[in-house]
């Protein structure tokens, strides 16, 4: 079946991580552009695989290239409603190919090819052939399939614009339905190869964290493959309509998370927030100093007012963990009328990147639009506090915000000998961070990067 492909193709490789040291090239991701799209057509040249742009053996090691995947399928039983369902399986099936890593979805894809795969003779043409076979196996209703892979920047840019128009068409349809209109929700387990205890709950008002699967997509997927990774959940008893807690959802999450999580609030970052996988489009995070919520999206390269970027924050709550005060979410959920409704919705949001704010501006209530800060208004807690006060943000009504900053006692700086930090060790970077202490003093770390397995503070 895969005899002419120089690397192994098997589900056993799903979950493989390709680190920088083992990487030949990176495709799309945060340093470039990319997209993926599946389109149902009336006719398709079956088995056609085309590569537009440099092939793997024409690329320079260590470089980053634009990348797009366009899959066209045809079949008498195929419907346009199934496009996003098939498309989301690209994540899973690409990872079947040894030496090829696929992360995220839609226009957020991030791929890598290992040096080992390149040395074995792997090319993008082989990826296209593998996808053709795998999709036919996964979806027997596909009668013909063609795959186009792009690494030419102009071709990827043009395709990206087309793909985004398609994404918006799908998303806008789902906005017409609400949780109260249906009796069934859905669960999705597609990310469990990377986040074994994560169970994604999809409702009309809460799109999957990846942003690629909405309630209609799940319904179509379940009808087509009732034994697949997407399953039905009878809505059943509503335990808390404001937080979005349902008895059957709790039971489904407990069963499919290996008992790790037994309660979930669909519309709150507090108490029992929805678990996070790793391919979420944004993170909502609590800012305790101001009793407000910040949101940072994957595309934002700067630091949040907490002093850490998206990547560090994502590492704190991904992998299927349930971390109070943090929750991965999709950008489409930010357009939902139930967006974090238990926490106050946008009236509790105090910071987000400018581009993200502009993309959801029409869904932010008018009375608070100009009161939510961006990186252009505030880059620290101090700046943010001042902005909120000057603009009379409603979050100030929840708790008093300090008018003055407490005095800080300068501590003599020490520079311990640097020790190389192995890859994968948790890192926290912060321009200013206060550590809890006792005895009438406190410790303030400024412009700190901390690599530590243990911190011991002793008073002589």
Swiss-Prot record:
Pfam families: ACS_CODH_B_C (PF19436), CdhC (PF03598)
Entry's cofactor comment: Binds 1 [Ni-Fe-S] cluster.
Region (Disordered): 402-422
Example GO biological process: acetyl-CoA metabolic process
Stored Gene3D superfamilies: Bifunctional carbon monoxide dehydrogenase/acetyl-coa synthase(codh/acs), Chain M, domain 3, Bifunctional carbon monoxide dehydrogenase/acetyl-coa synthase(codh/acs), Chain M, domain 5, Carbon monoxide dehydrogenase alpha subunit. Chain D, domain 4
UniProt KW keywords: Acyltransferase, Iron, Iron-sulfur, Metal-binding, Nickel, Transferase
Biased composition (Acidic residues): 402-416
Catalysed reaction equations from the record: Co(I)-[corrinoid Fe-S protein] + acetyl-CoA + H(+) = methyl-Co(III)-[corrinoid Fe-S protein] + CO + CoA
EC number(s) on file: 2.3.1.169
Cofactor(s) it depends on: [Ni-Fe-S] cluster
Gene Ontology MF, one: nickel cation binding
UniProt: [Ni-Fe-S] cluster binding residues: 188, 191, 277, 279
Stated role: Part of a complex that catalyzes the reversible cleavage of acetyl-CoA, allowing autotrophic growth from CO(2). The alpha-epsilon complex generates CO from CO(2), while the beta subunit (this protein) combines the CO with CoA and a methyl group to form acetyl-CoA. The methyl group, which is incorporated into acetyl-CoA, is transferred to the beta subunit by a corrinoid iron-sulfur protein (the gamma-delta complex).
Subunit-level organization: Monomer. The ACDS complex is made up of alpha, epsilon, beta, gamma and delta chains with a probable stoichiometry of (alpha(2)epsilon(2))(4)-beta(8)-(gamma(1)delta(1))(8).
NCBIfam families found in the cross-reference section: cdhC (TIGR00316), PRK04456.1 (NF003379)
Family: Belongs to the CdhC family.
Protein's recorded name: Acetyl-CoA decarbonylase/synthase complex subunit beta
Biological source species: Methanothermobacter thermautotrophicus (strain ATCC 29096 / DSM 1053 / JCM 10044 / NBRC 100330 / Delta H)
Gene: cdhC
């Amino acid at each position: 079946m895969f005899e002419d492909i120089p690397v192994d193709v098997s589900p056993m490789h799903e979950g493989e991580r390709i680190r920088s040291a083992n990487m030949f090239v990176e495709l799309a991701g945060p340093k470039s552009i990319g997209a993926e799209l599946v389109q149902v057509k009336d006719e398709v040249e079956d088995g056609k695989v085309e590569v537009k742009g440099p092939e793997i053996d024409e690329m320079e090691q260590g470089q980053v290239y634009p990348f797009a995947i366009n899959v066209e399928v045809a079949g008498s039983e195929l419907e346009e409603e199934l496009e996003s369902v098939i498309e989301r399986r690209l994540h899973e099936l690409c990872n079947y190919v040894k030496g090829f890593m696929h992360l995220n979805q839609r226009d957020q894809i991030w791929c890598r090819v290992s040096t080992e795969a390149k040395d074995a003779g792997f090319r993008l043409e082989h990826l296209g052939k593998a996808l053709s076979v795998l999709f036919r196996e996964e979806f027997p209703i596909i009668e013909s399939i063609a795959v186009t892979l792009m690494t030419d920047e102009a071709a990827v840019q043009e395709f990206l614009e087309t793909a985004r128009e398609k994404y918006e068409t799908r998303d806008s349809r789902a906005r017409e339905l609400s949780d109260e209109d249906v009796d069934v929700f859905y669960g999705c387990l597609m990310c469990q190869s990377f986040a074994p205890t994560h169970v994604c709950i999809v409702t009309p008002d809460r799109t999957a964290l990846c942003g690629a699967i909405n309630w209609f997509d799940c319904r179509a997927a379940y009808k087509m493959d009732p034994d697949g990774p997407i399953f039905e959940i009878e809505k059943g008893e509503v335990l808390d309509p404001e937080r979005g807690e349902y008895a059957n959802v709790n039971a489904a999450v407990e069963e499919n998370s290996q008992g790790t999580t037994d309660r979930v609030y669909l519309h709150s970052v507090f108490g029992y927030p929805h678990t996070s996988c790793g391919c979420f489009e944004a993170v909502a995070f609590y800012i305790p100093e101001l009793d407000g919520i910040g949101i940072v999206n994957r595309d934002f390269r700067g630091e949040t007012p907490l002093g850490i970027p998206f990547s560090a924050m994502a590492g704190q709550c991904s992998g299927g963990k349930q971390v109070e005060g943090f929750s991965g979410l999709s950008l489409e959920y930010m357009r939902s009328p139930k967006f974090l409704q238990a926490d106050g919705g946008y009236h509790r949001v105090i910071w987000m990147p400018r581009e993200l704010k502009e993309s959801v501006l029409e869904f932010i209530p008018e009375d608070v639009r100009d009161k939510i800060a961006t990186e252009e208004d505030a880059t620290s807690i101090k700046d943010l506090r001042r902005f909120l006060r000057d603009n009379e943000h409603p979050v100030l009504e929840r708790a008093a915000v300090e008018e003055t900053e407490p005095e800080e006692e300068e501590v003599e700086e020490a520079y311990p000998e640097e020790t190389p930090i192995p890859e994968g060790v948790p890192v926290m970077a912060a321009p200013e961070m206060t550590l809890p202490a006792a005895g009438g003093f406190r410790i303030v770390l400024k412009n700190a990067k901390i690599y530590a397995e243990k911190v011991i503070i002793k008073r002589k």
